[in-house]
């Protein structure tokens, strides 16, 4: 990954966007980008001076599109649209999501099809560099005509309104300040928006897109973790790796299935635990063990679909109207969020099912079968063992099921019927990340349970990779010989999942051991 990203000309990826948001990469405006932005700025000036009626430049918005606006009022119109459309409610977005909105919007505007002035684009990039991130309410977008309300809040600070998150004076987190106060402290004047700029700023899918970017990264991490954790559960339950045979999966060649089967084979190779029961009389394992390639693999296929479409949207122009290279303005529907809303809802089901099958493995670990003690503790009765953590997975799995209703299947007409079909993709994006929040906890509880269960297979050891995974978690959570506050253990483990460190460290160890878990399936890499 390059240390510098050129807005408008480089191809933006999920990793790039997250790197810019995290400060590992700097986004800049190149001379080529400046030229195309100035070209579209000139096109707007020509339209205004010609007196030609073009939506959003010298007309009202939505149902008011037929209302002409005089040339003297076009600038006022742009300020009014930011104020009138700032109607969001609810909690503020996480700072990282709001920052991603700025980054993805800057990249889209930098393509030179929106008619925005170079000075306005530069101010947006200044906010990113300064980490002066607008306060944006989480609710209020219907996902067409773009994410109007959240984007309006996002750009209020450009005109000296709204609020900002800025780095706290003690360097710990952010503090919330009035945008105008911050601009004054920086000796920066608010912008006076030109024709079309207000509409260009708030028309787009960057709210939906930013949640998609987060989800692509987070769900990928969960998918990688689920295979490792599932393999640990299989070992603890003395399951067989026979259902992961490559010849079997070649007969039903879904790429996700084949990848998961390969990963499980490699994770389990040369395991003394596995070799100890090769000749046992157990014919088949329960589905939650045997069908990991089919279930985890289906979720991977869904992730791949979302990842591919997110990549397209990251480099798309979702404004309306758009300005072509010849200065022609075309009014269309690139702002409609449906292309992301549907795959986000699809991924919601995929993430929920990953949690569903994980909960089933948690339950298997507690049953006291195949040589494991009931509830994974020897002195139960006095102790409840790992009984109650599975209550939490059951609750989270059920909550995820309620979040799987596809928001994109619903639509409520807005703007007096002019905008008569909307995507609700903003809800799809938010609830997918809620499902992933729950999924991370479910996987953390399975990892706790599997790590506990493997201890009862000693002195036999698992594969070198799974033993590393086990010892890694043991650095944070010890074996439980009696009851304790397991919520503290869960938080320790989930922090390792959410920081991506568990997957990163296990993957790095595998590579150092000469094992490439995803070889041949590079399309599933982030």
Located regions from the model:
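Well-ordered mid-protein domain cores that form the structural environment of catalytic cofactors
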Residues: 110-129, 133, 144-148, 156, ...
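C-terminal auxiliary extensions adjacent to catalytic cores
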Residues: 2-25, 30-33, 40-48, 74, ...
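Polyanion/phosphate-binding surface patch
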Residues: 52, 67, 260
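FAD-binding core of FAD-dependent oxidoreductases
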Residues: 55-77, 84-107, 137-159, 191-208, ...
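Short, solvent-exposed polar/charged micro-motifs at secondary-structure junctions
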Residues: 38, 65, 148, 416-419
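A residue-level detector for conformationally permissive "hinge/kink" positions
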Residues: 48, 52-54, 132-138, 152, ...
């Amino acid at each position: 990954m390059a240390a510098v990203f050129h807005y408008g000309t480089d191809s933006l990826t999920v990793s790039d966007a997250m790197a810019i948001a995290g400060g590992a990469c700097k986004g800049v405006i190149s001379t080529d980008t400046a030229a195309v932005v100035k070209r579209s700025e000139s096109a707007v000036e020509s339209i205004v001076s010609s007196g030609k009626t073009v939506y959003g430049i010298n007309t009202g918005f939505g149902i008011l599109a037929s209302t002409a606006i005089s040339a003297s009022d076009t600038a006022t119109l742009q300020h009014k649209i930011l104020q009138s459309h700032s109607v969001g409610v609810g909690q503020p977005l996480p700072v990282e999501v709001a920052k991603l909105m700025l980054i993805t919007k800057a990249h889209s505007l930098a393509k030179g099809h929106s008619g925005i002035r170079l000075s306005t684009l530069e101010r947006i990039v200044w906010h990113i560099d300064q980490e002066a991130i607008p306060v944006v309410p989480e609710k209020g977008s219907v996902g067409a005509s773009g994410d109007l309300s959240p984007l309006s809040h996002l750009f209020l600070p450009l005109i000296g309104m709204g609020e900002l998150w800025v780095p706290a004076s003690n360097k710990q987190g952010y503090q919330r300040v009035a945008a105008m106060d911050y601009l004054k402290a920086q000796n920066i004047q608010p912008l006076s928006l030109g024709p079309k700029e207000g509409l260009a700023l708030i028309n787009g899918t960057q709210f939906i897109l930013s949640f998609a970017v987060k989800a692509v990264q987070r769900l990928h991490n969960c998918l990688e973790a689920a295979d490792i954790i599932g393999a640990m559960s299989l070992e603890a339950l003395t399951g067989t790796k026979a259902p992961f045979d490559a010849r079997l999966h070649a007969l039903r060649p879904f790429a996700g299935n084949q990848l998961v089967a390969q990963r499980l084979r490699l994770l389990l190779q040369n395991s003394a635990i596995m070799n100890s029961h090769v000749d046992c009389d157990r014919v088949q394992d329960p589905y939650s063990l045997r069908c990991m390639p089919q279930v985890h693999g289906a979720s991977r296929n869904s992730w791949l679909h979302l990842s591919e479409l997110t990549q397209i949207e990251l480099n798309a122009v979702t404004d309306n109207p758009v300005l072509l290279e010849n200065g022609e303005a075309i009014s269309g529907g690139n702002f409609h969020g449906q292309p992301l809303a549907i795959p986000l809802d699809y991924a919601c089901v995929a993430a929920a099912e990953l949690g569903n099958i994980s909960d089933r493995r948690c339950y298997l670990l507690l049953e006291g079968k195949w040589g494991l003690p009931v509830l994974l503790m020897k002195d139960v009765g006095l102790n409840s063992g790992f009984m109650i953590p599975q209550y939490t997975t059951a609750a989270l799995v059920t909550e995820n099921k309620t979040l799987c209703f596809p928001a994109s299947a619903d639509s409520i007409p807005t703007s007096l019927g002019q905008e008569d079909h909307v995507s609700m993709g903003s809800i799809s994006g938010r609830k997918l990340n809620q499902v992933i929040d729950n999924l991370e906890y479910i996987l953390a509880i399975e990892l706790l349970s599997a790590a506990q269960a493997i201890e009862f297979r000693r002195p036999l050891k698992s594969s070198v990779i799974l033993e590393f995974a086990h010892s890694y978690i043991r650095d944070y959570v010890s074996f439980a010989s009696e009851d304790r506050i397991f919520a503290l253990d869960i938080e320790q483990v989930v922090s390792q999942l959410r920081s991506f460190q568990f997957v990163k460290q296990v993957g790095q160890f595998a590579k150092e051991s000469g094992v490439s878990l995803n070889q041949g399936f590079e399309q599933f890499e982030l």
